[in-house]
Amino acid sequence: MATASPHEIAHKLGSGLLSFPVTHFKDDHSFDEAAYRENIGWLGQFDASGLFAAGGTGEFFSLTPPEVEQVVRAAVQEAPDGLPVIAPAGYGTSTAVQMARSAESVGAHGILLLPPYLTEASQDGLVAHVKEVCAATTLGVTIYSRANAVYTEAAVAELADSCPNLVGFKDGVGNIEQMTRIYASLGDRLTYIGGLPTAEMFALPYLALGVTTYSSAIYNFVPKFAIDFYNALRSGDNAFVINALNEFVIPYCNLRNKKQGYAVSIIKAGMTVIDRPAGPVRAPLTDLDAVELAELADLIKKVS
């Protein structure tokens, strides 16, 4: 993996399902590195094509930059040979640059560039932001389009022309027209990743737009179901996909939608259900209550 080019790694990411592990915390909310390392090894038994350490599901927004480096280093050291580990970079441009360099120094294989913190920006500003991060690392960079960093097709095209190591586009918006425009403009120049919460909900229509993979949060606690769902999607077994949506994914999303922030909290709850607890979420997120946890356990039984 160390000798693979950024585009070769991006191609591997696009060929299978992507793992976005939670970050384990102790009861005092400090990073539980031993538990995290053990879990990365456990997830490595399954057939993911990439591992995104300390991403949104991993509570990136609640981690300090030194903690992000610690998490990424642990993931790199514990991931199976041949499994690319992608590290996050975010916040303001200077911080994102530092995080990208840090990730490269501890052996990450790529960068997921999250939106800048808090502030709104023009397309010119977003382009300048991405260019600086790309210039700071030899790793391949995937931009995450969501929230206050929604890229137009013109901006993505300019970045693809200007940054040889821009290799991926992750969509967290869900605008079918915009995704169509970007794919029509750039085609196979980039790897496209679905990045909406519970991405399985959007996987079927997005596949037609060149989005061949997505970040699967449920892979954390029902990895076999997540892989089976993905394989059915890619093989055109729509009957399996629709049945899986009705049996698990849609009811799961109904539970997830009960409270803001549950897109992450429910993943750690799922880990608790399968007796692989990852500790509490950090504030400002909140954990599921006992009734919600029991409801989730009933859903998991259906697909386990």
Swiss-Prot record:
Enzyme type, top EC level: lyase
SMART domains documented for this protein: DHDPS
Alphabetical keyword list: Lyase
Any one of the GO BP annotations: D-glucarate catabolic process
Pathway: Carbohydrate acid metabolism; D-glucarate degradation; 2,5-dioxopentanoate from D-glucarate: step 2/2
Sample GO molecular function, one term: 4-hydroxy-tetrahydrodipicolinate synthase activity
Pfam family, one: DHDPS
Listed transmembrane segments: none
Family: Belongs to the DapA family.
PANTHER family given in the database record: 5-DEHYDRO-4-DEOXYGLUCARATE DEHYDRATASE 2-RELATED, DIHYDRODIPICOLINATE SYNTHASE
Protein name: Probable 5-dehydro-4-deoxyglucarate dehydratase
